[in-house]
Amino acid sequence: LIEKAQTIFDNAIHAGWDEEYGGLLYFVDAKGLPPESYEHDMKLWWPHNEILISSMMLYRDTGNEQDLDWFFKTLDYCQKHFSDPVYGEWYGYLRRDGLPTMPSTKGSTFKGPFHLPRCLMQLDQMMTELEARA
């Protein structure tokens, strides 16, 4: 099962990571055709939360340094673009270039207090497990 999870993660991250601006694009076409969705080239907070969780989970379970690299690459992107260092919380929606959409949104019908706290709690638990092994 872990091999399948690794393959799915690797395929998704390589297909969706924006090599020009960083971050994960919200939609990419599996066949390389132009996406039909309006928000296809936006970066949303929750897929980045999922990258942080899944890359750390894979690293915890396999020791694969590439997964740890993806964790830190994604964390760096999130800290630079999603996180608001002045007023806290994360912006929910970024343009492709990494700037918040306008008006900027930290909470809405679709962005509530679930994904980010869940991500942080799961990361804390996994890092505690890794520290206990060391």
Name each model feature, range by range.
Residues 1-134:
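Glycan-recognition and catalytic cores of secretory/periplasmic carbohydrate-active enzymes
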